[in-house]
Regions:
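A glycine-rich phosphate/pyrophosphate-binding beta-strand-loop-alpha-helix module
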Residues: 1-31
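Glycine-rich anion-binding loops and their surrounding alpha/beta cores
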Residues: 20-27, 32, 38-251
Length: 251
């Protein structure tokens, strides 16, 4: 994955912050990230925008001053700093339905062989855990298709749509900068702790979110024709420690 530490206008909980809170190196070079991806004992990596496109990252202050969402926010997620030798797939979340067509066209133009867009809550890649979810996707740069998924069919029974934040969040440190109303780093640590617990097989909403998102990804990549089988495989690697082993194998 790739991203930034924080960005206007929402200054939310980025995966940069969550991974850093989990003890991961978020300053890898593009080559270091590529090496981790190609290592079968690791198989994943994060590379920051500061490393793969410093000129774009230098616009952060300007974007903060503009405040409102800019067009660059839509297209920067498709930069794809690391590409596969055979195929490269794009996976992201969307909130507003009109964006699916836009992202699909952009993904094709950017050279992504496959594209998977999941109807989510802002900033995530997991559908609602308690109601039917929808994805739009294409294979081999073809036309978009739609698919509905019911979390109950995967054995997911939750009363919440997503893992809830605590009722009382740590207040943001005093600063002259425009920022979120809560301490983003402290909340990122909460998210990291919940994620590590789920990777260690602790069941709950975070565990179910991992099962759901990963199962959809495996289904889209045609690793499993049946998403229920994909979900069972994800549970297996969460419960036997393999998923956590791969997470810890990364820098």
């Amino acid at each position: 994955s790739h991203g930034v530490e924080t960005m206007s206008p929402k200054f939310g909980i980025t995966h940069h912050r969550v991974l850093k809170a989990a003890g991961k190196d978020v300053t890898l070079s593009v080559q270091q990230a590529a090496d981790q991806l190609s290592d079968s004992s690791v198989g994943w990596a994060y590379v920051d925008q500061k490393a793969y496109c410093p000129a774009l990252h230098e616009l952060t202050r300007l974007r903060t001053n503009i405040i409102k969402r800019q067009a660059i926010t839509t297209v920067e997620v498709l930069t794809g700093p690391i590409r596969g030798k055979l195929k490269t797939h794009y996976m992201s979340g969307y909130v507003h339905k009109p964006y699916t067509r836009v992202y699909a066209m952009l993904a094709r133009h950017a050279g992504f062989d496959g594209c998977l867009m999941i109807r989510v809550f802002e900033g995530g890649i997991t559908p609602s855990l308690r109601q039917t979810g929808k994805v739009f996707y294409y294979h081999d740069k073809g036309e978009e298709q739609a698919q509905d998924f019911d979390p109950g069919d995967l054995g997911i029974q939750q009363d919440v749509r997503a893992t809830p934040l605590p009722d009382e969040l740590p207040p943001a440190p005093e600063s002259d900068d425009v920022s979120a109303s809560f301490d983003a780093d402290a909340v990122a640590k909460m998210a990291a702790d919940a994620g590590l617990a789920a990777l260690n097989g602790e069941t709950g909403s975070t565990y179910d979110a991992m099962v759901y998102s990963a199962a959809i990804a495996l289904w889209h990549l045609k690793k499993y024709n049946d998403i229920k089988q994909a979900a069972d495989k994800v549970r297996e690697v969460l419960n036997n420690g393999e998923a956590l082993k791969h997470f810890h194998a990364a820098s």
